[in-house]
């Protein structure tokens, strides 16, 4: 009896435990409701402040991600080895890093840093070539507290044209004739031998140095993902440290713990590894190469502080954020080493930012990976600690054959460099030690040296690149001919040109100091169809020397330039020819060759040739050209603006609510409601409203008068362009120029120092948009004007460029999250998702999942080839998941009467839908979500509201997946073990069987199972437990109706829970609401039956406290379920949950959209827009085609002309059969393929 009483008390305690969990869930629901309410209010506030379209979406995305990081950090153990095998490496979202970021946010009054990984912008860092015939001295002068260098040429202080780039790799020191003392001080085993850029000495007696290890700059940007251009890195020159452990000293003006330092390092390294996986594909050589860099020695990385440092102002970087005019992006690496930061002022920054009257200190770059740790058993070893074995000093050289060697930059591209000083020596780029089995291979070598006292270990990694069409390894007439192979690499040609002061149309004069950082512009070939066809038709694009060729459209008037000729031999085998011979006659130096992979909409390689041109001028560093990936679009009545993340559409006949800029910026200026027919009308409106500063064309141009310059306005492809003489121009009138950024300069006059601010935080940028003013600069030459972002505190201001106002921070990655919750916008045309999955997408009242799928299939084909070919790790995960699908499918073929399982075939079907959604969602997240919605509908789990019914999406989705991956390795590999048709048919057969058995009403019953030890029969027949009113029964009425696509679909007519314990009824009702609101993401595995999911949650909770596995029924209703019971259902449920959670992070944002209030919908308007935008029409063929493709006896096909109304007929008539829709899908893909490869007429 005592035992029985104890057991009853035990059950009572367990029940209290369960109710505690339920109450927690209710609280979570209320919090979720509150958050949604706040979110809607927030959207309203944003709209009232002018945020619309992309700006609104980006702001919403930013806000939601800040909240989500807290949940992510709690859900993921960042140091767990298991998590590293997931689709992303989330180790950088550690609790420590979260704490650190939140702490930093207290000192940065405009928000926490972004927390979702993103690919960095191109980091254009260039070396200024040293004239080989000149002897260059770098004279060390200064004391232990203040290191400075004089750069002398032939014994004289260097003039402006003689900026110098030091390649501090050991072998390169000799080439530059450096003095021995300098060599010993800078290049030794304890110093990191990266290329370091120095500016020259000015003539007014002040010394302005720029010392930035270029690769470290790239590392910071890549690791943080923050769009911060100006991160300066101090090189510490100090005496030998006695201890072998160099403690990382990081000072943000606030106390930091070792864990926070650990988090910073871990975030840095994990992001580097993540970027490696995506950028460098499956090349283990590349990955090995990058892992070498992870061991680099970093002690101080100073963040992008941009300070209005008039004399005596802003000395403390972290005090008076607005009062001192500090505009900074505190990345996770934005730290200062000095113990007294208020005495430190930055005196060197990149790309036009400059300060004056600043004390200079340089520091040794030392290890960040060795630090003291507490190895207690309750602490998990961090990533930084695990890789501490590679933290030794090393040098890096990357050489292409016998050229000058040295590493130019390792950004998101691989970088090569070869020397073209002497065209007759160009065959040197073929290494003598080339792989004998691959005679056409060029080898790039990276060497890492690990030094331990007197022992040095050198590791060399070779990166092989194919270069063909060499005649016996000889290059005739100095022309390098590189065939771009199928591996997805294209050549980006870069060249640097330094200006002399005398070449500038105006000079700074007086005591103005100039930051002579070489700035390279980028010009890209654009056409109505594709860069490839443009090159084919025009025989290449020439960039002529302004001194040799005079044209109306010449680029670089009165400026020395260089000649680059692009030619193509065939569309199937594109190539780039660089006329080095003519180049070498006039110009000596290193010509960097950048290799990048680009994929177009069809999954093929897109060869968007582009040359990078320098555009520095002495009087004002003003302009840079930008290039984006070319996406071929036919000319229509629409106009387009390209950005990193897709296409922004501008319709002339529509009323705009804002002006859209080339680089994706959204200037939230409201244009009066009126129709306009040309860009000139917009121009007039903006001008009349004194908002000329919001237009791209107001970027200053050297050699042009803004007041009289005429512009072409939108080109055929929507870019901004002009014909008048400017800094640089294309020669071909169809080509366009894209000014996306300009730089300000500094002056030591009474106006104080002025700085350019590039690419800073979204929220701050949007705040500043409202305070942009335009005013003239009295000391600006040639009447040029700059745009200032005022902080309202002093006469100084900040020059902001358009790139800084870019509102979308994240580039597209496979499986990238989109987070949109209840977005309400004024103009339905303006919503543009930020990650380029769609050309455009609208929220509307209806949901046409069919076209949702068509859009995804057309857009995501960009990524599927890369994933299928380059990511074996993900493929393994997919295969494991599909194994689970097959396992569930096999289980599903057993009827409930044949097994002791406590769920019906419908439950298993729902889980198959869930798992299938998880698999598909890895590549097509929205389709994966749609499959899960279909699973909810078909299996009667969850409550589906009107308008959310998915008609036949499973058939289309599976067929679409097969279409997309057709011909690639993934399909070939999967076909060996699974067939999509087989899975699809099996599910259909089982559903048919269930319909035969249950009719159109399926009763879904969940009843607990009893242990025979208690004397209860173990018969497989369903039976209730205890009293009737304690039986937990869920009943779902499913109506099977005909479907316009595949003839059948399931609709939920009613879902009820009957005979539930009264104390549980409200809880289940709340949980239903929670499922609708959150899409199951944060709380339950998607698609599982509610009660099953509930049991899983409770079972796991109970497991944690060692009470054994017990069902919710058994616990709540006082029935015993011992831990010894080997119940397949529960173990399977738990297994499913674990498997699903692996993909929850990827799919969460997409599933979030499948909720009660809003879904991502596509209606006829967007269909019309998509097809119109691409010049695609649906036309009725005059003759009847194949019967299987007929619609009411008429065949509809996709062509490049015709009446769009036929497409509407296909959609609205309800007569489309599955074959015709497949035809449309296939033709869409074919159309993109033809568009990117066919020549332009």
Curated annotation (Swiss-Prot):
Q: What is its main location?
A: host cell
Question: How does this protein sit in the membrane?
Answer: Multi-pass membrane protein
- The residue ranges flagged as biased composition, category Polar residues, are 1013-1028
Work out whether the entry's keyword set contains Transmembrane helix: yes
Cellular component terms, GO, for this chain's entry?
host cell membrane; membrane
- Membrane-spanning regions, if any? 261-281, 918-938, 947-967
Keywords of the record, alphabetical order, are: Coiled coil, Host membrane, Membrane, Transmembrane, Transmembrane helix
Where is the protein found, in the record's own terms? Host membrane
Where are the residues of the annotated region Disordered? 1005-1028
Q: Note the coiled coil stretches, chain numbering.
A: 21-49
This protein's name:
Uncharacterized protein S3
Organism listed in the record: Diadromus pulchellus idnoreovirus 1
* Encoding gene (name): S2
């Amino acid at each position: 009896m005592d035992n029985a009483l104890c057991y009853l008390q035990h059950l009572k305690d367990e029940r209290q435990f369960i109710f505690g969990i339920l109450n927690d869930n209710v609280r979570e629901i209320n919090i979720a409701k509150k958050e949604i309410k706040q979110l809607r209010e927030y959207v309203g506030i944003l709209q009232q402040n002018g945020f619309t379209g992309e700006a609104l979406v980006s702001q919403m995305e930013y806000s939601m991600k800040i909240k989500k990081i807290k949940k992510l950090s709690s859900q993921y153990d960042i140091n767990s080895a298991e998590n590293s095998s997931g689709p992303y490496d989330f180790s950088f979202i550690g609790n420590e890093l979260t704490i650190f970021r939140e702490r930093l946010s207290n000192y940065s009054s405009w928000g926490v840093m972004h927390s979702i990984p993103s690919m960095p912008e191109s980091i254009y860092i260039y070396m200024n070539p040293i004239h080989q015939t000149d002897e260059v001295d770098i004279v060390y002068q200064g004391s232990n507290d203040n290191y400075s260098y004089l750069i002398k040429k032939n014994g004289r202080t260097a003039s402006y044209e003689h900026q110098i780039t030091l390649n501090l790799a050991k072998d390169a020191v000799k080439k530059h004739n450096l003095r021995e003392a300098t060599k010993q001080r800078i290049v030794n085993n304890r110093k990191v031998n990266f290329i370091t850029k120095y500016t020259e000495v000015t003539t007014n007696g002040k010394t302005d140095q720029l010392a930035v290890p270029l690769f470290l700059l790239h590392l910071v940007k890549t690791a943080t993902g923050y769009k911060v251009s100006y991160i300066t890195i101090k090189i510490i020159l100090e005496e030998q440290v006695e201890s072998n452990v160099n403690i990382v000293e990081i000072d943000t003006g606030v106390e930091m713990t070792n864990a926070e330092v650990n988090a910073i390092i871990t975030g840095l390294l994990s992001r580097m590894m993540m970027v490696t996986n995506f950028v460098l594909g499956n090349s283990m050589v590349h990955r090995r190469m990058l892992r070498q860099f992870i061991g680099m020695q970093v002690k101080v990385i100073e963040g992008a502080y941009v300070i209005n440092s008039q004399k005596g102002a802003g000395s403390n970087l972290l005090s008076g954020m607005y009062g001192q005019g500090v505009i900074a992006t505190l990345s996770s690496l934005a730290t200062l080493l000095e113990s007294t930061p208020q005495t430190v002022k930055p005196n060197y920054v990149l790309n036009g930012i400059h300060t004056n009257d600043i004390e200079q200190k340089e520091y040794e770059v030392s290890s960040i990976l060795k630090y003291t740790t507490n190895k207690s058993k309750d602490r998990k070893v961090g990533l930084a600690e695990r890789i501490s074995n590679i933290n030794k000093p090393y040098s890096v050289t990357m050489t292409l054959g016998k050229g000058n060697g040295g590493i130019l930059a390792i950004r998101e591209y691989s970088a090569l460099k070869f020397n073209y000083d002497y065209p007759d020596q160009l065959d040197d780029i073929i290494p003598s030690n080339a792989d004998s089995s691959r005679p056409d291979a060029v080898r790039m070598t990276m060497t890492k040296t690990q030094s331990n006292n007197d022992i040095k270990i050198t590791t060399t990694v070779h990166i092989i690149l194919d270069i063909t069409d060499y005649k016996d390894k000889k290059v005739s007439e100095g022309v390098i001919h590189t065939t771009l192979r199928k591996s997805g690499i294209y050549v980006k040609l870069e060249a640097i040109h330094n200006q002399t002061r005398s070449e500038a149309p105006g000079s700074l004069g007086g005591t103005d100091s100039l930051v002579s950082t070489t700035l390279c512009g980028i010009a890209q070939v654009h056409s109505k169809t594709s860069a490839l066809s443009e090159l084919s038709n025009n025989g290449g694009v020439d960039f002529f020397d302004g001194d040799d060729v005079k044209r109306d459209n010449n680029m670089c008037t009165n400026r020395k330039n260089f000649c680059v000729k692009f030619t193509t031999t065939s569309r199937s085998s594109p190539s780039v020819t660089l006329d080095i011979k003519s180049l070498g006659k006039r110009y000596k130096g290193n010509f960097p060759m950048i290799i990048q992979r680009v994929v177009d909409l069809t999954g093929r390689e897109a060869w968007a040739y582009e040359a990078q041109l320098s555009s520095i001028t002495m009087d004002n560093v003003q302009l840079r050209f930008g290039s984006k990936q070319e996406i071929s679009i036919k000319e229509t009545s629409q106009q387009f603006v390209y950005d990193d993340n897709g296409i922004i559409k501008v319709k002339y006949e529509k009323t705009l609510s804002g002006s859209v800029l080339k680089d994706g910026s959204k200037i939230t200026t409201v244009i009066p409601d009126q129709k306009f027919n040309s860009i000139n009308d917009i121009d007039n409106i903006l001008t009349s409203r004194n908002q000329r500063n919001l237009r791209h064309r107001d970027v200053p141009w050297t050699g042009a008068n803004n007041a009289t310059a005429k512009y072409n306005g939108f080109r055929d492809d929507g870019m901004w362009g002009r014909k008048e003489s400017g800094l640089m121009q294309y020669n071909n009138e169809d080509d366009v120029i894209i000014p996306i950024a300009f730089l300000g300069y500094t002056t030591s006059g009474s106006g104080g120092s002025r700085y350019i601010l590039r690419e800073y935080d979204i929220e701050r940028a949007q705040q500043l948009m409202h305070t942009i003013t335009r005013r003239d600069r009295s000391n600006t030459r040639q009447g040029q004007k700059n745009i200032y972002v005022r902080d309202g505190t002093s006469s100084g201001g900040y020059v902001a460029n358009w790139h800084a106002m870019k509102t979308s921070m994240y580039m597209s990655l496979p499986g990238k999250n989109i987070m949109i919750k209840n977005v309400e916008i004024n103009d339905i045309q303006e919503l543009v998702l930020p990650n380029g999955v769609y050309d455009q997408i609208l929220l509307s009242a209806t949901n046409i999942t069919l076209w949702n799928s068509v859009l995804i299939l057309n857009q995501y084909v960009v990524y599927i080839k890369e994933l299928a070919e380059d990511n074996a790790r993900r493929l393994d995960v997919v295969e494991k998941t599909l194994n689970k699908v097959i396992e569930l499918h096999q289980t599903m073929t057993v009827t409930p009467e044949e097994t002791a399982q406590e769920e019906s075939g419908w439950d298993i079907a729902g889980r198959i839908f869930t798992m299938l959604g998880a698999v598909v969602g890895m590549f097509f997240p929205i389709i994966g979500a749609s499959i899960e919605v279909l699973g909810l509908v078909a299996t009667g789990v969850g409550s589906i509201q009107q308008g959310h019914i998915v008609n036949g999406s499973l058939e289309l989705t599976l067929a679409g997946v097969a279409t997309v991956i057709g011909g690639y390795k993934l399909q070939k590999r999967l076909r060996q073990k699974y067939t999509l048709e087989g899975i699809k048919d099996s599910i259909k057969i089982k559903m048919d069987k269930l319909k035969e058995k249950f009719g159109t009403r399926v009763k879904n019953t969940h009843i607990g199972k009893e242990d025979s030890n208690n004397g209860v029969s173990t018969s497989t027949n369903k039976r209730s437990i205890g009293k009737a009113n304690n039986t937990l029964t869920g009943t779902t009425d499913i109506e099977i109706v005909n479907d316009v696509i595949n003839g059948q679909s399931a609709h939920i007519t009613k879902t009820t829970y009957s005979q539930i314990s009264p104390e549980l009824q409200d809880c289940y009702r709340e949980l239903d609401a929670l499922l609708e609101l959150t899409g199951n993401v944060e709380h339950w595995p998607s698609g599982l039956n509610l009660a099953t999911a509930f049991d899983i949650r409770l079972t796991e909770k109970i497991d944690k406290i060692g009470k054994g596995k017990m069902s919710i029924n058994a616990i709540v209703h006082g029935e015993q379920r011992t831990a010894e019971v080997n119940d397949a259902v529960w173990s399977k449920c738990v297994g499913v949950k674990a498997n699903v959670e692996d993909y929850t992070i990827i799919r969460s944002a997409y599933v979030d959209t499948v909720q009660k209030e809003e879904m991502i919908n596509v209606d006829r308007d967007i269909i019309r827009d998509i097809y119109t935008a691409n010049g695609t029409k649906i036309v009725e063929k005059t003759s009847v085609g194949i019967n299987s493709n007929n619609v009411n006896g008429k065949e509809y096909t996709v062509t490049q002309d015709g009446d769009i109304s036929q497409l509407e007929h296909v959609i609205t008539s309800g007569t489309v059969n599955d074959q015709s829709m497949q035809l449309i899908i296939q033709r869409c893909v074919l159309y993109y393929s033809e568009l990117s490869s066919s020549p332009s007429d």
